Structure formats: structure tokens, C-alpha cells
Amino acid sequence: MINDIETLRRALKRGDYCGIVLYEGPSRIDGAPIVAIACRITEASGNAKTGAMVQTFIMRQDIAPHEALKTGDDSSVCGDCPLRPIHKGATRCYVRVYQAPLSVWNAYNRGRYAIPGVDFDAALLPKLFEGLSFRIGSYGDPAAIP
């Protein structure tokens, strides 16, 4: 277990981990299993609009995001958003779930995200994120997590 902030930052920069798991548990929307993940902690995003921001993804633990979108199980993380494709004729969400969200979900399922209390001391989180800007909900509604 990593117990100091510099070692954790080095592990993230080296690519030992792709990011940090912020939450694993039931959705506050419907109780289904979800995960919240923070990425791009030590490096800038390639997204010119967001730049150097920590990206957060809130998604189902048990169903790939593109599959959840097809079946309507995305409601666990998107609630009753009018941009969900289940609403026929509505403007569709701009998030391409088969791109970044699917990549994050696949990496999560391969164990590529550090888990507080397992891989590193959870007390390091405030120091790790100190001074960083966040894009809350790059995919998923933050209301789904406590």
C-alpha cells in the first residue's frame, strides 16, 4: 500500500494506475452498482475545451456504458435526463460512450484504477487533488454518488 503522496503521484505518472476509484457502491438514483472514477490527475487531457482538468466518470460497474445506453440501464447514472436516447425524438447526449467512457470502464475492469484503502492510504486524497480543477461528470450525473 502506498503511504506517501509523492509515491502515489509517481505511480500515476508512471502509468501504474490510470487514475483513482472515488466510489463503488449503489446508485443514489436506483440502487444499481456504480463506480465513480477520476482520471487525468497528473496529465492534461487532449480535450482543448477542458485542458488540464481531472475528468470524472460515473458509470455502471456491471454493464459497459454503451450496453447500458442501449438497454436503458444508464438510468442508474443518468437519471431521467432528457438527453438519454431512450427518450424518442429528443436531442441526444453529446457523450460518445463508446469512446472515453468505454475505455475507462474497460480499464476499471482490468484493475487499472487505484482503490483508496487498498492500493494507497485514503488520507492522501485531499493532498492528491489539492489545487486541481475538476470536470465533474465527464460522463454520468454526480447526483448518483453520495
Protein language model annotation of sequence segments:
Residues 1-146:
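Class I S-adenosyl-L-methionine
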